[in-house]
Structure formats: structure tokens, C-alpha cells
């Protein structure tokens, strides 16, 4: 798509600033189920609907493939600080991870250009009553990319040699690897460092709160 289309998307996102999620939901032409409202990913789904993300574009695609843009929301408190790490993408734990490089990785595609939308409201505020903040588009600086790449490569090195379960919250400067599953009984196969097939909880990459905080400050 042309630059105008990116500008159109950005202006649409900017136009949401100041509205509550409840107001945005009421503007949609389709009903929203009660189960979705109670879901942690509810706000993100509503933003996808209102901004025109094609939910059928495939699991491995970014949200706006023709623009090369991923959509991410950041829950922040009334002081503007992120409430939680930001989920980026799931991590492949199978042997096909061996052929992944930084530039051809799903993770890289996900973070190459991001449309960030802050969602304002402390933890006690219901999803519907949270307020949309001012959107901004972010692309990595050379310094940011160097740090992100270093973290990513260190994590992938551990995963490739079968040491995913050795990864802790202490690893990574701006990235985190965390368990990503509804409950501890959800498991997937991986090959451990002894070459044995084992089961573990799915993992995902997250931006640390301190990193998204720095992005929010740079956007001002």
C-alpha cells in the first residue's frame, strides 16, 4: 500500500484517543459476546475490529501485512507506566528453530514497525471503562535493534540447545521469555539438552515494562 494508506491508518488510530472502550464497542456494527468482554485480550480484539485488521490473514502474518505494521496495545496506569510486559509472539520450540536468523524470524517481522496504542486505566478499572491514549508508530533505532537482537539471539541459543527451561526472568535486557498458556497443564514437545523429547509449557517473547516505558517517553 502507499504511504497515504499508512497515514490513513494512523489518523484513524489517533482519532480513537480519549474514547472509552465502551464507547468504541457501542460504535461497532456487530455484537460483542460477554465471554470476550471478560477475556484479557478483549481490548486488543476491539482495536483490531475498529481498525480493520483481517482476522483471517493467518497466524504467522502481522496485523497489516501490506503496510508492514503490527498493532500493539499497552495497558498503562494513570501515571503513564506500563502495567505489564507486552506480548510480542509465541516461540517455536521445535527443531525448525535451527534455521531461524534475526532478519527472517517471525519475531523480527512482528517488531519491525509497530502501531502502539496506550490503554489508560489502573488494574481495578474494568476493560470497558479504560480510555484510549494517543497512538504512535515506532520503528527500531539502530541502538534499539542492537539490544533487541542481542537478547533474541541469546534466548534462541538457549532454546536451540534444549535449555528453554533454564531461562528465567533474569535473562534479557529488554526482552523476556515467559510461559504463555491458559493453565499449567497445556504442554508442547521440545528436545532437551540431552536429546530427549520432553514436554513443557509454551513460551513467548515479551517486551519488558521498562522498555515499553522508554518507547512511551520517546513518543512524547
From Swiss-Prot:
One of its GO terms (molecular function) is DNA binding. It holds the Pfam family MutH. It comes from the Bacteria. Keywords: Cytoplasm, DNA damage, DNA repair, Endonuclease, Hydrolase, Nuclease. GO terms for cellular component: cytoplasm. It is found in: Cytoplasm. Gene3D superfamilies: DNA mismatch repair MutH/Restriction endonuclease, type II. Sequence-specific endonuclease that cleaves unmethylated GATC sequences. It is involved in DNA mismatch repair. Belongs to the MutH family. This is DNA mismatch repair protein MutH. It comes from Buchnera aphidicola subsp. Baizongia pistaciae (strain Bp). The lineage of its organism: Bacteria, Pseudomonadati, Pseudomonadota, Gammaproteobacteria, Enterobacterales.
Amino acid at each position: 500500500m502507499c504511504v497515504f494508506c499508512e497515514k490513513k491508518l494512523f489518523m484513524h488510530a489517533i482519532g480513537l484517543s480519549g474514547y472509552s472502550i465502551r464507547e468504541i464497542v457501542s460504535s461497532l456494527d456487530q455484537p460483542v459476546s460477554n465471554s470476550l468482554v471478560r477475556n484479557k485480550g478483549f481490548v486488543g480484539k476491539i482495536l483490531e475490529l475498529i481498525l480493520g485488521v483481517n482476522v483471517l490473514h493467518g497466524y504467522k502474518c502481522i496485523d497489516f501485512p501490506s503496510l508492514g505494521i503490527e498493532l500493539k496495545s499497552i495497558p498503562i496506569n494513570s501515571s503513564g507506566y506500563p502495567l505489564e510486559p507486552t506480548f510480542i509472539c509465541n516461540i517455536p520450540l521445535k527443531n525448525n528453530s535451527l534455521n531461524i536468523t534475526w532478519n527472517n524470524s517471525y519475531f523480527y517481522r512482528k517488531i519491525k514497525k509497530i502501531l502502539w496504542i496506550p490503554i489508560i486505566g489502573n488494574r481495578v478499572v474494568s476493560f470497558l471503562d479504560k480510555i484510549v491514549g494517543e497512538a504512535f508508530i515506532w520503528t527500531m533505532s539502530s541502538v534499539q535493534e542492537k539490544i533487541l537482537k542481542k537478547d533474541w539471539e541469546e534466548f534462541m541459543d538457549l532454546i536451540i540447545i534444549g535449555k528453554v527451561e533454564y531461562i528465567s526472568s533474569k535473562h534479557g535486557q529488554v526482552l523476556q521469555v515467559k510461559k504463555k498458556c491458559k493453565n499449567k497443564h497445556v504442554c508442547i514437545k521440545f528436545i532437551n539438552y540431552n536429546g530427549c523429547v520432553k514436554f513443557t509449557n509454551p513460551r513467548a517473547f515479551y517486551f519488558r515494562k521498562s522498555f515499553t516505558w522508554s518507547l512511551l517517553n520517546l513518543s512524547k
